[in-house]
Amino acid sequence: MHWTSILSAILLFCLSGARASPAKTVIRNKVPLLVTNACTRIFQKVTWEYTSKSKRSSPVCSYEPAFQSMLYCIYETLDEKGYSNKTLEKTFSTIKKNCASYSDALQNMTNSEFYDVLNNGTRHMTPYVKGSANLTYPVEMDTQLRKAYYHALHGFYANLDVGNIYGGIICAYFVAIMAFAGVLHCMNYTPFKTVLLKQKLVGYVRGYLTLPTIGSKHASDFSYFRIFTGYLPTRLEGIIILGYLVLHTVFLAYGYEYDPENIIFKSRRVQVARYVADRSGVLAFAHFPLIVLFAGRNNFLEYISGVKYTSFIMFHKWLGRMMFLDAMIHGSAYTSYTVANKTWATSKNRLYWQFGVAALCLAGTMVFFSFAVFRKYFYEAFLFLHIVLGAMFFYACWEHVVSLSGIEWIYTAIAIWIVDRIIRIIKASYFGFPKASLQLIGDDLIRLTVKKPARPWRAKPGQYVFVSFLHPLYFWQSHPFTVLDSVSKNGELVIILKEKKGVTRLVKKYVCRNGGKTSMRLAIEGPYGSSSPVNNYNNVLLLTGGTGLPGPIAHAIKLGKTSAAAGKQSVKLVIAVRGFDVLEAYKPELMCLENLNVQLHIYNTMEVPSLTPSDSLDISQQDEKADEKGTVVATTLEKSANPLGFDGVVFHCGRPNVKELLHEAAELSGSLSVVCCGPPIFVDKVRNETAKIVLDKSAKAIEYFEEYQCW
């Protein structure tokens, strides 16, 4: 078990012992509770001929005339509103709960005894005269006053309840979207998907709204002054996020029922501050389950919808930002409330207040260190801080509401976290902890091969696993890698590692110290992610480069073995690489394609072909040309050397012309699926060019599958 799981388990243990019995969230705006509390408040303010030695006392619970007056107030209010005796009897239970801390005498009272008290009080009931003091008899309150108290409490309680309802709707919004995505995902495995893609309206929607990036960036980050960096959603993700933001804004700003007479609160300002504080606080906590679910590896919505983990991380970020905004509004509004109510001096010393301040500070720190610049350059530090601060934030939030309400949102988030960790442990244990062979290839690549477990275990093309290298210096780290089935030895997995910062650099140093070839014990957890369903398309174009080769190569091998029988007209794999070291790492898999029904084109971007005057004049025979940004691209006439040693591959120098490749594929008869995984700029280029092709050929079934993942 990784150190993060251990830390979180300790946190859960602390939470379980934090308080003996956390306060449950109840629906407050129910008639029995509402009318009982309204009448209780009325008669708490009356001066009775009542004294008590106990500091905790209430005349409506302990002094019979006050108790009779409250019962009659409840009866009259319910009678005016047309409620039956059944509702009246529910108020008896509410009275018992309210008075449990003040009087034991009421706890064993039967409904008949409550009616006897009510009838006895009714016979002696006297209209209340304002200013009366030391009352020894039951009194009847003015109807307008009763209605005013009822309305005031109704607005206050409704605001608390509706916050939870709105939070539930936000959760349901994302679940509904993922359910709809799941329906579309299931259609990928039926002929209906290609029929749907041929509809012109669908093509226009996809070409303008769902496929393209916002601007020209999604996988690649935007940057201002090298400090303000980040990642933009796709247009579809942007639409979903916009819908969420609209919902959230409406839920935060709409539906308040203010009391014009300010019966409960001292002024309109105090009332508004309290209502906004309560609403924003409840909405903040409603984000807990989704934030934990979307960050988890075993997200059931990912399995249902087929939506990539990258998209869920995008939603996770926006949910986190809005949760922090809600918390800021909650803290500011509640501070304003206590200042205006002149209770700040005492409130700030309360435990819930102090933990609320701590939670807000922790949330702000988490948001700050989640900026893309920290994730990009200091990922391990970011991950460590995110987990530690997240655990502390959970604890602070628990303590903040443990005696109030809202704990159920934390319960749900903890349950999601526990299920995720249990599944992760099961997956890692199922694979076992085998020894893997590691071989250094070139300067920065490592080919890792490991035996599969004896029991059934299968990873589809494009799926990935999380690997922990069980070395004393970095066993606690877990990193994702796309996996391939070995073509040279049955029952083996292949993972290609490229040296970067962090654990891959340490692993490379370890391999180098052992002569470039060694073994190491691993923990493998997976597989995760979904495989792009390309089998139902007549033509498949696989575009890849950089470290994104495993998925498309695995697709090519699988399609090459089945394409003839499945009626595939064309399977084309286009690989862009900087030098041939990466080809050496994948040589067994690429050599396997020689005898398969796959067109393999490899572009060496380190070699730039030379232009001749005749090339530039004759467009039909030119070897390469510059795209709109001046990037040199190559065509089939300018060849590079063939390091693989077989004739089933066409080598080019320069960069692939994405637009041209897509147009060529789109001209083929039948449906087309485009699969892309590679460097961020390359992925964004393919996505946007595919969107243009979909618009140009809106009556043709063209689908785009992106296997690029951002962690």
From Swiss-Prot:
| Residues in compartment: Extracellular | 24-164, 257-280, 341-353, 399-400
Q: Which Pfam families match?
A: FAD_binding_8 (PF08022), Ferric_reduct (PF01794), NAD_binding_6 (PF08030)
User: What is one GO cellular-component annotation here?
Assistant: fungal-type vacuole
The residue spans the entry assigns to the Cytoplasmic side of the membrane are as follows 186-235, 302-317, 375-377, 424-711
Q: How does it sit in the membrane?
A: Multi-pass membrane protein
Gene Ontology biological-process entries: copper ion import; intracellular iron ion homeostasis; iron ion transport; nuclear-transcribed mRNA catabolic process, nonsense-mediated decay
Residues that, per the record, bind heme 1: 316, 386
Glycosylation sites recorded in the entry for this protein: 85, 108, 120, 134, 341
Domain (FAD-binding FR-type) ranges: 415-534
Q: Supply the name of the protein.
A: Ferric/cupric reductase transmembrane component 2
Q: Which gene encodes it?
A: FRE2
